[in-house]
Amino acid sequence: MFSEQELAFLRAQPLARIATVDNEEQPTVDAVGFEFDGARFSIGGHQLETTRQYQNSVAGHCKVSLLIDDLKSLRPWQPRGIRIHGIAEIVHRQGHLGPGSSLAITPRVSWSWGMEEPGTEPAKVGPRKIIWQ
């Protein structure tokens, strides 16, 4: 459901930030690597099972927020990004370094900004919201 501009942006980004909540309802944000397969985001990594985002998901806190952003330009100021609210689940899959666990994030709602066609004024366009099925 992402546009071609959004997909190209996702492919070019090496990092995302994931927000989860712990048992005390304390939000926490961590930088993570990610992959997007067209339907779900995968978060993996070395010793994933020891990370806060993994432990929070194991504890049943499956609602997450994922942010992928950058600055296209400082002058003029041109921030761009994609924010996803979704559901995380732990999956076991074959990764780059062999079998292991990962967090699979299924988007429920996403917003993007700064992905406008050249010549389009961002202030008039506003964030693009997608409700995922």
Question: For each of these PLM feature ranges, what is it?
Answer:
Residues R11-Q13, Q26-P27, G81, H96-G98:
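Short solvent-exposed loop/turn micro-motifs enriched in small/polar/acidic residues
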Residues Q13-L48, L66:
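Short beta-strand segments
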Residues S102-Q133:
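Flexible glycine-rich active-site/ligand-binding loops centered on an Asp-His dyad
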